[in-house]
Amino acid sequence: MWDNPRLLNGAAGFLVGLTVLACTLAAGNWLLRSSLFPVRVVEVSTPLEHVSRQDLRAVLAHYAAGNFFAARIDELRAAAEQVPWVRRASVRRVWPDRLEVAIEEHVAFARWGSEGLVNTQGERFAAPSGAALPLFIGPPGSEAEITRRYARFVETLAPLGSPLERVVLSARHGWQLRLANGLQITLGRDVDAADDRLTRFVEAYARSGNVRADVVDLRYPNGFAVRTRG
């Protein structure tokens, strides 16, 4: 072996590579454990409208303490997303001693039963809110569908001049609407067919003058039933 230059060169290269790897691992371990690189600043880079800065600071302080290189970025992000009104959070290291946090807040679109809110993406979330919002009621998992349908209902009902304040989707997939003026509209389960019926009803109701209805049933294929106010 000792008189074989090729083997000697190969062995030397292997030893050099092993030494470099060991040094790299040692340096990495030192960087992770060293107190020379503390996180000094945790900065929220986005303006906040609903998120409590106090709650967010408490989360960030707990997960961001310690070494710049060892900061638990994924855990910090996941914890920040548990703070009320936070939809998404992203965290990045900024050399030499800063963590930058970007927050995307939920935008409340409706109330969901008595349990929470629905955002503009049709996602349910829990957060306090005193805003005047429409009420959605439906089976778990139907939030996005109700949000999508709500926009169509609002457009169709606009000529009536009364806001749509409640949308109910039953467990059997039956739809029911209520306007701010008290008018209740039953669409039934075939909501696609009911779209045309709702349009026809709105046109007829707008022409009816002084007639004021309490309840409208649109489940009939060739017409609708109306209960008027006495």
Where are these regions (language model features)?
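Short secondary-structure junctions
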Residues: 82-87, 156-163, 209-211
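Extracytoplasmic segments of membrane-associated envelope/inner-membrane machinery
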Residues: 99-188
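Solvent-exposed beta-strand sheet faces enriched in polar/charged residues
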Residues: 45, 92, 168-170, 219
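Solvent-exposed, polar/charged alpha-helical surfaces in well-ordered, non-transmembrane soluble domains
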Residues: 54, 58, 74, 78, ...
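N-terminal positively charged amphipathic segments used for targeting/anchoring
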Residues: 1-38, 49-50, 54, 64, ...
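Soluble non-cytosolic domains of exported or imported proteins
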Residues: 50-54, 66-74, 140-148, 191-196
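Generic beta-strand hydrophobic packing signal
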Residues: 42, 89, 136, 167, ...
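Terminal hydrophobic membrane-targeting helix
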Residues: 30-129
